[in-house]
């Protein structure tokens, strides 16, 4: 799996795009390797776990959350992931499959503080909100902290302030902007692959869509596009 993924990374780099995240099969193989890591691959395996598995309710996220929950509860072990680290990483998964294990861990005397900090910054908890509220009403101190943090919107107030000024490069597009500009039909096959599909944006030169510096426009990291009208379709 590691050799194949490294080859994939190289192929994507040649296209100027980041590698795809791991799918559920690759993540399952990663979990197996994390439990018994090959010598010299430890840092790479940890990086894949932390940064290359999608968050939320993707099936790969399910595999990751299940593994981390098992480590946190002592049901699985890895020399590369401690119980505390497993709980912390659950807290980076935004919402979805990570929420139930974090709520359960509010009852763990050792790990409850870490689980609470994770939940304070997690908004997509859905029905699990009531589980946290019930624990708080039953006297669970960690759950009380989470409820108070949500009430105080610390998930928002703890974030960096919006910069007073933002410098951008303006690319003015005259006329109506539509799918042919932002998501050309001939590139529809790549739409699920957002970084790759982004290379097709504004590729079709037309009157009003002709960059002054076409070879440089893709190098700009932050651009403000001004247009007369954006057509209300698949864009």
Language-model-detected regions and their locations in the chain:
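Amphipathic alpha-helical packing elements
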Residues: 2-31, 36
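Residue-level detector of alpha-helical secondary structure
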Residues: 8, 29-32, 44, 181, ...
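Fe-S-dependent hydro-lyases/dehydratases of central metabolism
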Residues: 115-235
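Short inter-helical turns and helix N-cap capping residues of alpha-solenoid HEAT/ARM repeat scaffolds
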Residues: 38, 78-79, 107-111, 140
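Residue-level signal for cytosolic alpha-helical hairpin/rod architecture
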Residues: 6, 27, 83-84, 99
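Amphipathic alpha-helical scaffolding segments comprising HEAT/armadillo-like alpha-solenoid repeats
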Residues: 24-32, 55-74, 93-107, 124-136
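Short helix-loop boundary/capping segments at the starts of domains
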Residues: 36-39, 51-58, 188, 207
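Structural detector for internal amphipathic alpha-helices that build alpha-solenoid repeat scaffolds
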Residues: 15-20, 42-59, 73, 80-95, ...
């Amino acid at each position: 799996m590691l050799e194949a993924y490294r080859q994939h990374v190289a192929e994507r780099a040649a296209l100027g795009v980041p590698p795809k995240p791991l799918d559920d099969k690759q993540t399952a193989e990663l979990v197996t390797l994390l439990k018994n890591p090959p010598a010299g691959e430890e840092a790479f395996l940890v990086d894949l776990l932390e940064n290359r598995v999608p968050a939320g309710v993707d099936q790969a996220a399910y595999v990751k959350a299940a593994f981390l929950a098992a480590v946190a509860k002592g049901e699985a072990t890895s020399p590369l992931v401690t119980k505390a680290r497993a709980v912390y990483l659950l807290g980076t998964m935004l919402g979805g499959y990570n929420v139930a294990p974090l709520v359960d861990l509010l009852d763990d005397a050792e790990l409850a503080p870490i689980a609470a900090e994770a939940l304070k910054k997690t908004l997509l908890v859905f029905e699990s909100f009531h589980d946290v509220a019930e624990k708080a009403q039953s006297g669970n101190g960690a759950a009380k902290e989470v409820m108070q943090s949500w009430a105080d919107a610390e998930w928002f107030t703890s974030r960096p302030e919006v910069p007073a000024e933002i410098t951008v490069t303006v690319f003015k597009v005259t006329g109506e902007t539509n799918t042919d500009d932002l998501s050309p039909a001939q590139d529809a096959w790549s739409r699920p692959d957002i970084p790759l599909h982004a290379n097709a944006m504004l590729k079709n030169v037309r009157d009003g869509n002709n960059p002054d510096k076409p070879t440089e426009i893709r190098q700009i990291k932050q651009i403000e596009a001004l247009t007369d009208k954006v057509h209300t379709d698949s864009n």
